[in-house]
């Protein structure tokens, strides 16, 4: 998870000022073969996602340059622009950080970067999830409340601003709970191994459980519920219109109550939601399993853990491909 750590790193009954914990060399992590494969695939996905998302942003920029009379981007293109920015931010922070951390195994960047990068990591994970909520809400309102949407031209931009603001606020606790710890031998002397973890940040075990559940809910459960509800309302509304007058949904006609372009954006929204759900569900299910059964880490192999994480990283790669497919 975004703020998870190993059981040894999450002891609650300890001094908050303690910066070293007793570990043995046998407990130290190492870069295994599966870890090397994870690093290789992570950097490959980093290049792929950066290329796809940067290309889409460049395409939007060129499109605005060609527009005549200073016309602005459509609302859907503005939403896609911010989703792409969020995906690019996640790509540029999460993927290199994970890849380099797996190579070095321990943390060399110091206390300040431990806190700042932990904050930026969670911020960059919140942003795409919240932007998916904004897109789903906007498309749902466009179908179910079209007059209200037209009368409030600033609604979309307000939701976008709120998504970025909440992402920055909800990631704030990372600056407090993450810190550097050092390996200590039996005599209490540090042995040069350091790590960036949440050790001693939570006075009681349930404090950490609550925070983990909060981040899990904001990153996955709440966005998923919003997307399901919004898409269900869209389907219900379209089904009702179809039953009232089947000719209203004939795509081959130029004059439709629901134009072909709008139906295409609706399909694209559903595809975005499907990509988000399929890519992230295995990763978060594994995280929930670990909360209820910490010994699970000893039963699930490292390659499986690595696969679920890498599968989640496909999401920012898929989004620009989805837009490209529906733009053909």
Curated annotation (Swiss-Prot):
Matching PROSITE patterns: G_PROTEIN_RECEP_F1_1, G_PROTEIN_RECEP_F1_2
TM region positions: 39-59, 85-105, 116-136, 158-178, 209-229, 272-292, 307-327
Topological region Cytoplasmic: 60-84, 137-157, 230-271, 328
InterPro entries reported for this sequence: GPCR_Rhodpsn (IPR000276), GPCR_Rhodpsn_7TM (IPR017452), GphnRH_fam_rcpt (IPR001658)
GO terms (BP aspect): cellular response to hormone stimulus; G protein-coupled receptor signaling pathway
Topology of the protein relative to the lipid bilayer: Multi-pass membrane protein
Pfam families found in the cross-reference section: 7tm_1
Keywords: Cell membrane, Disulfide bond, G-protein coupled receptor, Glycoprotein, Membrane, Receptor, Transducer, Transmembrane, Transmembrane helix
Extracellular side: 1-38, 106-115, 179-208, 293-306
Residues carrying covalently attached carbohydrate according to the record: 18
Intrachain S-S bonds: 114-196
GO MF: gonadotropin-releasing hormone receptor activity
Cellular component, GO annotation: plasma membrane
Cellular localisation: Cell membrane
Family statement drawn from the similarity comment of this UniProt entry: Belongs to the G-protein coupled receptor 1 family.
Task of the protein: Receptor for gonadotropin releasing hormone (GnRH) that mediates the action of GnRH to stimulate the secretion of the gonadotropic hormones luteinizing hormone (LH) and follicle-stimulating hormone (FSH). This receptor mediates its action by association with G-proteins that activate a phosphatidylinositol-calcium second messenger system.
Name recorded for this polypeptide: Gonadotropin-releasing hormone receptor
Organism name: Equus caballus
Record gene name: GNRHR
């Amino acid at each position: 998870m975004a703020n998870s750590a190993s059981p040894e790193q999450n002891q609650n009954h300890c001094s908050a000022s303690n910066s070293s914990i007793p570990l043995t060399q046998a407990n130290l992590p190492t870069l295994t073969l599966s870890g090397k494969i994870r690093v290789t695939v992570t950097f490959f996905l980093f290049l792929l996602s950066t290329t796809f998302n940067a290309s889409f942003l460049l395409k939007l920029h060129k499109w605005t340059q060609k527009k005549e009379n200073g016309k602005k981007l459509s609302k859907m293109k503005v939403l896609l622009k911010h989703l792409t920015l969020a995906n690019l931010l996640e790509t540029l922070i999460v993927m290199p950080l994970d890849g380099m951390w797996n190579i070095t195994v321990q943390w060399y960047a110091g206390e300040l970067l431990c806190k700042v990068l932990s904050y930026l990591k969670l911020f960059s994970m919140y942003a795409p999830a919240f932007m998916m909520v904004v897109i789903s809400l906007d498309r749902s309102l466009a179908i179910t409340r079209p007059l209200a949407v037209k009368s409030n031209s600033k609604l979309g931009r307000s939701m976008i601003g709120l998504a970025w603001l909440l992402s920055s606020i909800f990631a704030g606790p990372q600056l407090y709970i993450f810190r550097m710890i050092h390996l200590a031998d039996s005599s209490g002397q540090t042995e040069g191994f350091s790590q960036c973890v949440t050790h001693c940040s939570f006075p009681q075990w349930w404090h950490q459980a609550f925070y983990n559940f909060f981040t899990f809910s904001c990153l996955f459960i709440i966005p998923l519920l919003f997307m399901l509800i919004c898409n269900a309302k869209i389907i219900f509304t379209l089904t009702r219109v179809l039953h009232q007058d089947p000719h209203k949904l004939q795509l081959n006609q130029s004059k439709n109550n629901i134009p072909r372009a709008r139906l295409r954006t609706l399909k694209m929204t559903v595809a975005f939601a499907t990509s988000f759900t399929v890519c992230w569900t295995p990763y978060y299910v594994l995280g929930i399993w670990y909360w209820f059964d910490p010994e699970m880490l000893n039963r699930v192999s490292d390659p499986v853990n690595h696969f679920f994480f890498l599968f989640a990283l496909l999401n920012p790669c898929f989004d620009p491909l989805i837009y490209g497919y529906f733009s053909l």
